[in-house]
Amino acid sequence: MVRNVTVDAAAIARKSKRTLQTVFHEVTMDLAFEVVKATPWKTGFLRGSWFTELNNPGTPLASVEEDPSGAYTVARLSAKITEARIGDRIYVMNGAKYAKFLEHGTQHIAPRAFVRGTVNRAGAIAKRTLARIKAKET
Protein backbone atom coordinates (compact mmCIF):
# COMPACT_ATOMS: atom_id res chain seq x y z
CA MET A 1 0.00 0.00 0.00
CA VAL A 2 1.48 3.33 -1.05
CA ARG A 3 0.16 6.52 0.47
CA ASN A 4 1.24 9.89 -0.82
CA VAL A 5 1.60 12.71 1.65
CA THR A 6 2.08 16.09 0.04
CA VAL A 7 3.03 19.10 2.12
CA ASP A 8 3.71 22.52 0.61
CA ALA A 9 7.24 22.90 1.95
CA ALA A 10 7.78 26.00 -0.22
CA ALA A 11 4.93 27.82 1.52
CA ILE A 12 6.33 26.81 4.88
CA ALA A 13 9.82 27.98 3.88
CA ARG A 14 8.47 31.36 2.74
CA LYS A 15 7.10 31.90 6.24
CA SER A 16 10.46 30.99 7.75
CA LYS A 17 14.09 32.04 7.48
CA ARG A 18 15.04 28.44 6.78
CA THR A 19 15.80 27.11 3.33
CA LEU A 20 13.29 24.99 1.47
CA GLN A 21 15.70 22.05 1.78
CA THR A 22 15.79 22.37 5.58
CA VAL A 23 12.00 22.62 5.85
CA PHE A 24 11.65 19.60 3.53
CA HIS A 25 13.96 17.55 5.77
CA GLU A 26 12.42 18.65 9.06
CA VAL A 27 8.82 18.05 7.99
CA THR A 28 9.70 14.63 6.57
CA MET A 29 11.64 13.67 9.69
CA ASP A 30 8.73 14.71 11.89
CA LEU A 31 6.33 12.61 9.81
CA ALA A 32 8.68 9.62 10.09
CA PHE A 33 9.00 10.17 13.85
CA GLU A 34 5.23 10.28 14.24
CA VAL A 35 4.62 7.06 12.30
CA VAL A 36 7.30 5.24 14.31
CA LYS A 37 5.88 6.58 17.58
CA ALA A 38 2.36 5.51 16.55
CA THR A 39 3.54 2.00 15.62
CA PRO A 40 2.33 -0.55 18.17
CA TRP A 41 5.04 -2.54 19.85
CA LYS A 42 5.36 -5.61 21.98
CA THR A 43 8.93 -6.68 21.29
CA GLY A 44 9.99 -3.67 19.22
CA PHE A 45 10.38 -5.65 15.99
CA LEU A 46 7.61 -3.75 14.18
CA ARG A 47 9.06 -0.36 15.17
CA GLY A 48 12.53 -1.52 14.18
CA SER A 49 11.27 -2.65 10.76
CA TRP A 50 10.74 0.87 9.37
CA PHE A 51 13.16 1.82 6.59
CA THR A 52 13.55 4.64 4.10
CA GLU A 53 14.47 4.71 0.43
CA LEU A 54 14.86 7.62 -1.95
CA ASN A 55 13.04 7.75 -5.30
CA ASN A 56 12.22 4.03 -5.53
CA PRO A 57 10.69 1.64 -3.03
CA GLY A 58 13.42 -0.66 -1.82
CA THR A 59 13.54 -4.01 -0.16
CA PRO A 60 13.13 -4.50 3.59
CA LEU A 61 16.18 -4.57 5.80
CA ALA A 62 18.00 -7.90 5.87
CA SER A 63 18.19 -7.84 9.65
CA VAL A 64 16.15 -5.79 12.08
CA GLU A 65 17.03 -4.73 15.60
CA GLU A 66 14.16 -4.75 18.06
CA ASP A 67 13.58 -1.11 18.98
CA PRO A 68 10.76 -0.71 21.53
CA SER A 69 11.46 3.02 22.02
CA GLY A 70 11.81 3.69 18.28
CA ALA A 71 14.82 5.96 18.92
CA TYR A 72 17.32 3.95 16.87
CA THR A 73 14.82 3.57 14.03
CA VAL A 74 14.08 7.31 13.94
CA ALA A 75 17.83 8.07 13.87
CA ARG A 76 18.31 5.61 10.98
CA LEU A 77 15.37 7.08 9.04
CA SER A 78 16.59 10.64 9.69
CA ALA A 79 20.07 9.85 8.37
CA LYS A 80 18.57 8.68 5.07
CA ILE A 81 16.09 11.57 4.88
CA THR A 82 18.92 14.11 5.13
CA GLU A 83 20.33 12.67 1.87
CA ALA A 84 17.15 13.68 0.02
CA ARG A 85 17.06 16.72 -2.24
CA ILE A 86 14.11 18.82 -3.36
CA GLY A 87 12.20 16.80 -5.95
CA ASP A 88 13.15 13.43 -4.49
CA ARG A 89 10.47 11.00 -3.38
CA ILE A 90 11.00 9.64 0.09
CA TYR A 91 9.54 6.20 0.76
CA VAL A 92 9.06 5.31 4.42
CA MET A 93 8.10 1.64 4.61
CA ASN A 94 7.77 -1.15 7.10
CA GLY A 95 9.24 -4.53 6.23
CA ALA A 96 7.49 -6.58 8.92
CA LYS A 97 5.19 -9.05 7.18
CA TYR A 98 2.48 -8.58 9.80
CA ALA A 99 2.44 -4.76 9.64
CA LYS A 100 -0.51 -4.67 7.22
CA PHE A 101 -2.55 -6.93 9.50
CA LEU A 102 -2.04 -4.59 12.45
CA GLU A 103 -2.70 -1.53 10.27
CA HIS A 104 -5.92 -2.82 8.69
CA GLY A 105 -6.99 -5.48 11.16
CA THR A 106 -8.32 -8.96 10.54
CA GLN A 107 -11.42 -10.80 11.60
CA HIS A 108 -9.67 -11.40 14.94
CA ILE A 109 -7.67 -8.18 15.38
CA ALA A 110 -9.04 -4.64 15.41
CA PRO A 111 -7.24 -2.23 13.03
CA ARG A 112 -4.61 -0.03 14.66
CA ALA A 113 -4.34 2.49 11.77
CA PHE A 114 -0.91 3.76 12.83
CA VAL A 115 0.03 4.68 9.24
CA ARG A 116 -3.37 6.01 8.17
CA GLY A 117 -3.65 8.00 11.39
CA THR A 118 -0.28 9.63 10.77
CA VAL A 119 -1.17 10.38 7.13
CA ASN A 120 -4.44 11.97 8.27
CA ARG A 121 -2.50 14.21 10.67
CA ALA A 122 0.21 15.16 8.12
CA GLY A 123 -1.02 18.74 7.70
CA ALA A 124 -1.15 19.31 11.45
CA ILE A 125 2.29 17.73 11.88
CA ALA A 126 3.72 20.07 9.20
CA LYS A 127 2.15 23.10 10.93
CA ARG A 128 3.67 22.00 14.24
CA THR A 129 7.05 21.65 12.51
CA LEU A 130 6.75 25.19 11.17
CA ALA A 131 5.87 26.49 14.63
CA ARG A 132 8.97 24.77 16.04
CA ILE A 133 11.14 26.22 13.26
CA LYS A 134 9.76 29.71 13.89
CA ALA A 135 10.34 29.36 17.64
CA LYS A 136 14.01 28.50 16.99
CA GLU A 137 14.36 31.65 14.87
CA THR A 138 13.19 34.04 17.57
Provide a role label for each language-model segment.
Residues M1-T138:
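Short, Lys/Arg-rich flexible segments
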